[in-house]
């Protein structure tokens, strides 16, 4: 999905990489950068970076159900931080749980590449879809 990596300035600035996309699912990677640190003495990434990745991944997963001219916008988001995210790449995986005509509900899981089976955060994203009519 070149749109995600190349055509959205914020995504390009963050360096987000699409690893896998299929209907109702997305897996994105956020390469580690020192400026993503939240607490350098603890070696932990900033929670806002984790939330940003969750939001983007959730939107991408939902967007797979719609056309290229439809717009997906987050209206509600909850992120539970389960443990500190170490200084390493983050991997986000999003699964669409409900895809309606105008609303989507997505579950997102974030892990570090150093321990891919252990979530550092989980969240729920609710999005509004504005369909191109």
Which positions does each model-derived feature cover?
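Feature marks short, surface-exposed loop/turn motifs that line or immediately flank catalytic pockets
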Residues: 34-36, 60, 129-131
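HotDog/MaoC-like acyl-thioester-processing domains
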Residues: 85-87, 91, 95-133
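Catalytic strand-loop segment that frames the active site of acyl-thioester-processing enzymes
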Residues: 15-44
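Compact, glycine-rich, soluble single-domain proteins
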Residues: 42-55, 59
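Hydrophobic beta-strand-centered segment that forms part of the acyl-chain substrate-binding groove
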Residues: 59-91, 96
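Hydrophobic residues in beta-strands and at strand termini
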Residues: 30-32, 81, 129
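Extreme N-terminal tail/first-helix region
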Residues: 1-11
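A generic structural signal for short beta-strands and their flanking turns/coil linkers
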Residues: 12-14, 24-26, 71-77, 88, ...
